[in-house]
UniProtKB/Swiss-Prot annotation:
NCBIfam families: flav_wrbA, PRK03767.1. Binds 1 FMN per monomer. It catalyses: a quinone + NADH + H(+) = a quinol + NAD(+); a quinone + NADPH + H(+) = a quinol + NADP(+). InterPro entries: Flavodoxin/NO_synth (IPR008254), Flavoprotein-like_sf (IPR029039), Flavoprotein_WrbA-like (IPR010089), FMN_Rdtase-like_dom (IPR005025), NQO (IPR037513). Its cofactor is FMN. Gene3D superfamilies: 3.40.50.360. This is NAD(P)H dehydrogenase (quinone). NAD(+) binds at residue 12. FMN binds at residues 10-15, 78-80, 113-119, 134. Keywords: Flavoprotein, FMN, NAD, NADP, Nucleotide-binding, Oxidoreductase. Pfam families: FMN_red. Its EC number is 1.6.5.2.
Length: 199
């Protein structure tokens, strides 16, 4: 049975919802799953003034936690076409794990969100995936077995590189059922791959 970590940063709850969907998909494949978030770097007064969702159920992750899992799925919103500073800061602290090769051979994946359809989701996924490849991980994206990314009848996220959602400029659009289904599908694929590789 694979042990999967869904590691995320979510300012307004969109990525939190996607993280829980990824976790649900991994559990459907029989994995043991933990959902953890990275620490907020924005001062609390500023976060409250900007209506950040600070009451998230997931516990805070510690960098050394990463070595305990067969698979790690990383999610964060887009910040100017790249991952958030909160997630980048957390991953930057994993140099010791990198130096020891502690993440070699683990399965990795990425998911993201943006305000608009062309708001940098794919480049954000690439920024996450680049980190995971440097750690020596095997990447699993959102393959075209998920038919929900093939249609054009609705506005929807999703790319072969990972599940995504579109939040709208004011954050008013929650992840759609299709986007959540994509996240569940990717979570299941990652858990199944980890089980094959790690038994």
């Amino acid at each position: 049975m694979a042990k999967v970590l869904v590691l995320y940063y979510s300012a307004y709850g969109h990525i939190e919802a996607m993280a829980n969907a990824v976790a649900d998909g991994a559990r459907q494949a029989g994995a043991t799953v933990d959902v953890k978030r990275v620490p907020e770097l924005v001062p609390e007064a500023v976060a409250k003034a900007k209506y950040f969702k600070l009451d998230q159920a997931a516990p805070l992750a510690k960098v050394d936690d990463l070595a305990d899992y067969d698979a790690i799925v990383v999610g964060t919103g887009t910040r100017f076409g790249r991952m958030s500073s909160q997630m980048a800061s957390f991953l930057d602290q994993a140099g010791g794990l990198w130096a020891r090769g502690a993440l070699h051979g683990k399965v990795g994946g990425a998911f993201s969100s943006s305000a608009t359809q062309h708001g940098g989701q794919e480049t954000t996924l690439f920024s996450i995936i680049t980190n995971l490849l440097h750690f020596g991980m095997t990447i699993v994206g959102l393959n075209y077995g998920f038919a929900g990314q093939m249609g054009v009848k609705e506005v929807t996220g999703g790319a072969p590189y990972g599940a995504t959602t579109i939040a709208d400029g004011d954050g008013s659009r929650p992840p759609s059922e299709n986007e959540l289904a994509g996240a569940r599908y990717q979570g299941r694929m990652i858990a199944e791959t980890a089980a094959k590789l790690h038994g």
